[in-house]
Regions:
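Intracellular loop-helix junctions on the cytosolic face of multi-pass helical membrane proteins
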Residues: 1-22, 147-148, 175-282, 304-305, ...
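Short amphipathic helix-loop junctions that connect adjacent transmembrane helices
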Residues: 39-64, 258-287
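Central cavity-lining transmembrane alpha-helices of secondary-active solute carriers
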Residues: 66-87, 292-305
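Glycine-rich segments within core transmembrane alpha-helices of 12-TM secondary carriers
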Residues: 76, 151-179, 186-197, 201, ...
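Conserved MFS/SLC helix-loop-helix module at the cytosolic interface between two early adjacent transmembrane helices
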Residues: 79-113
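Cytoplasmic membrane-interface "Motif A"-like loop-to-helix N-cap segments
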Residues: 89-101, 311-330
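C-terminal ends and interior cores of transmembrane alpha-helices
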Residues: 99-120, 326-351
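Hydrophobic core of transmembrane alpha-helices in multi-pass small-molecule transporters
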Residues: 107, 118-133, 348-375
Length: 464
């Protein structure tokens, strides 16, 4: 039975396939580039036009900025559907990740050029590149583990820490460089990170074996699965996956205020002045640097949250992926109450009582958002790889990221309402909506779990 989860030729490091760490570092650098660019995107668009100044931006209003941000991030993830489909039908995940990495290197390099045409052209390359890379590298992580290997969830937690290590370093370093030297130096630095990731991937291909190969190849043992119709169990699992995407849309619609409304709130309405001076940045913390807080908490808490759920499951308590995702939405909702408190410091009974709110409320909000994210996001990635039929593995992962993209668009639309509704009303409304939604998912959990037909109940006998 041991061969169910571990094959003799599989090389391991710290209890996981070596290939996991290859993908860990590739995704770390890809996320360094993406989140580094994202940390300064809305700030760049909203910055005033100052000819000849490296800090000159587009001079857009908050509403215009948040609308564009939502649309851009939506398309970044919507392209995961064709990216996953092309991988499933024509080239396989391994080549799709390679192609995506090349396009991302080109896109980020173009962004370093200080010209309007370069900005929009670079974003187009990034949108297409992420569409090829993002769903397929996640599917490859799942492909490292055989059916029934309960290391899969923990493997995705490790992978997720890599994502957020890159996000932390990207937001911190790119944000600081952009604040000191100019926006396009920040964009260029993000491109260097992506180039490093591409080099790591090319070197690490030998550790991935056949994982990510196109199953339609003549010598593929799974070739016949492309023609085999879905059975009832597979159809039910597809249905519950699509239903779970609604959770994803709600979660990211709230969470992605971090790159939109919360980013602008940090820049315009948060007291970022320290009583002491820090090397390189002085005594005022750049607004973009605050986006590294979430990633920092994930690096610190990722293993602990994963271990908590593992122990929780061993005690025989409810630990399905859908339950964890619902709990994640509720925990994230509590984070927005701290943003409500921040907004209330500025506005009390309709009157302005303070010019800016304290930084501590942002930190506490990001803490709860992080715990919620750790309960929902890596679990959702693993959930898709457990339930998706092999012939649609990358397509369904692409659909997951498309749901993330829709959530990003929703985030931009919600954030844009703050110009009329007010920050306090938006933050409080998000908190209430997410709490009610999470409780509703828990209430209908049993029928949803039946549709999975025990996909998460298969346990490995021995992982040693």
């Amino acid at each position: 039975m041991n061969n169910l989860v571990k094959q003799p030729h599989e090389k391991e490091l710290f209890g996981h396939p070596v290939g996991l760490y290859v993908l860990f570092f590739v995704e770390m650098w890809e996320r360094f580039s993406y989140y580094g660019m994202r940390a300064i995107l809305t700030l760049y668009l909203a910055a005033p036009i100052i000819l000849g100044d490296p800090q000159s931006g587009f001079g857009w209003s908050n509403g215009e900025t948040l609308s564009f941000y939502g649309t851009y991030t939506m398309f970044v993830y919507l392209t995961s559907i064709p990216g996953g489909w092309i991988a499933d039908k024509f080239i396989g995940q391994k080549k799709a990740v390679m192609l995506g990495g090349i396009l991302l290197c080109i896109g980020h390099s173009i962004l370093a050029i200080n010209a309007q045409w370069a900005f929009f052209t670079g974003l187009i390359f990034i949108v297409i590149g992420v569409g090829f890379l993002k769903p397929n590298i996640s599917t490859m992580v799942g492909g490292l583990y055989n059916q029934g290997d309960d290391r899969r969830d923990r493997g995705f937690y490790v992978f997720y820490i890599g994502i957020n290590l890159g996000a932390f370093l990207g937001a911190l370093i790119v944000g600081a460089v952009a604040a000191k030297y100019g926006w396009h130096y920040g964009f260029g630095l993000a491109g260097i990170g992506m180039a490093i990731g591409q080099i790591v991937y090319m070197y690490g291909l030998k550790y991935l074996g056949t994982v990510g190969e196109f199953i339609g190849k003549a010598d593929s043992p799974n070739k016949d699965l492309l023609k085999k119709p879905l059975n009832k169990v597979e159809k039910d699992r597809m249905l519950v996956m699509f239903l779970s995407f609604l959770i994803i849309i709600v979660f990211w619609g709230a969470f992605e205020q971090a790159g939109g409304l919360m980013s602008l709130y940090t820049d315009q309405k948060t007291d970022r002045i320290l009583s002491f001076s820090l090397p390189f940045i002085g005594n005022e913390i750049p607004a973009a640097v605050f986006q590294s807080i979430n990633a920092f908490f994930i690096i610190v808490l990722g293993t602990a949250v994963g271990s908590f759920w593992h122990k929780w499951k061993n005690k025989g308590k409810e630990s399905s992926s859908l339950f964890k995702m619902a709990i994640g939405v509720i925990i994230m909702a509590f984070g927005f109450l701290f943003m409500s408190k921040a907004a209330s410091e500025i506005l009390m009974n309709g009157d302005v009582v303070a010019e800016k709110s304290a930084m501590i409320w942002l930190v506490l909000a990001y803490l709860f958002h992080t715990i919620g994210e750790l309960c929902a996001s890596p679990v959702a990635l693993s959930f898709i790889t457990k339930l998706a039929p092999i012939k649609y593995a990358s397509f369904m992962m692409g659909a997951y990221f498309a749901a993330t993209g829709i959530g990003n668009k929703v985030a931009g639309a919600i954030g844009g309402l703050s110009e009329n509704a007010g920050d306090f009303e938006i933050f409080t409304g998000i908190a209430i909506t997410c709490t009610v939604f999470g409780l509703l998912i828990i209430a209908i959990l049993k029928p949803l779990k039946r549709l999975t037909h025990g996909a998460e109940d298969i346990q490995a006998i021995d992982n040693n």
